[in-house]
């Protein structure tokens, strides 16, 4: 894999504690699933089992996102064909760490958003952003402090990023007992966004 390793380069065999630890063998031949996948449920389950322990601390989800949608570079080459102008783009991130300025992703919430909007040719209505992260800095927080395998770090930069998308952004607590309500709300938003999406002329 050599030069193809690094943030933003799509799914590789999920590694780390409780990860699937195997190549999910996407039928697309790329690092993403598409409509040609014969068993989407099983393949998604394989790719989504990313584990509970990061092999590369600190986590930098926003830096990975920006690299994945960049118009050029190694990550762009690895993800070729994934970003389509005839479809909406749904970004989902799940982390118990704050993507802070000191040791987290480069840039700012405003810059991360600008990168996403640019990837969709300026059509912010074609984006949905979903985030599960620490809520310790909010009233009625579910998370306690991050200690070993419990709790989370407060995530003001991640919250600012999601909130900047208004009705097209949904936040939830990484420490919630169930993510069911979060994803049920997300599915509704994705459907509404798809229904209202008008693809640009090709």
Stretch-by-stretch model annotation:
Residues 1-202:
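Divalent cation-coordinating acidic motifs and surrounding scaffolds
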């Amino acid at each position: 894999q050599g030069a193809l390793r690094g943030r933003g380069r799509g799914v590789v065999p999920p590694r780390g504690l409780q990860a699937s630890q195997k190549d999910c063998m996407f039928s697309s031949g790329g690092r993403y699933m598409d409509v040609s996948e014969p068993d989407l449920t099983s393949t998604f389950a394989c790719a989504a089992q990313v584990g509970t322990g990061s092999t590369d601390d600190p986590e930098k989800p926003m830096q990975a996102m920006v690299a994945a949608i960049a118009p050029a570079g190694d990550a762009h080459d690895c993800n070729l064909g994934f970003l389509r102008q005839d479809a909406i783009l749904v970004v989902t991130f799940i982390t118990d760490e704050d993507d802070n300025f000191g040791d987290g992703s480069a840039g700012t919430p405003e810059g991360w958003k600008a990168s996403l909007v640019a990837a969709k040719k300026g059509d912010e209505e074609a984006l949905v952003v979903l985030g599960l992260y620490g809520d310790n800095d909010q009233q009625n927080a579910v998370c306690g402090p991050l200690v070993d395998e419990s709790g989370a770090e407060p995530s003001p930069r991640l919250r600012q990023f999601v909130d900047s998308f208004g009705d097209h952004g949904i936040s939830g607590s990484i420490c919630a007992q169930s993510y069911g309500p979060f994803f049920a709300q997300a599915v509704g938003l994705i459907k509404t966004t798809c229904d209202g999406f008008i693809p640009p002329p090709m």
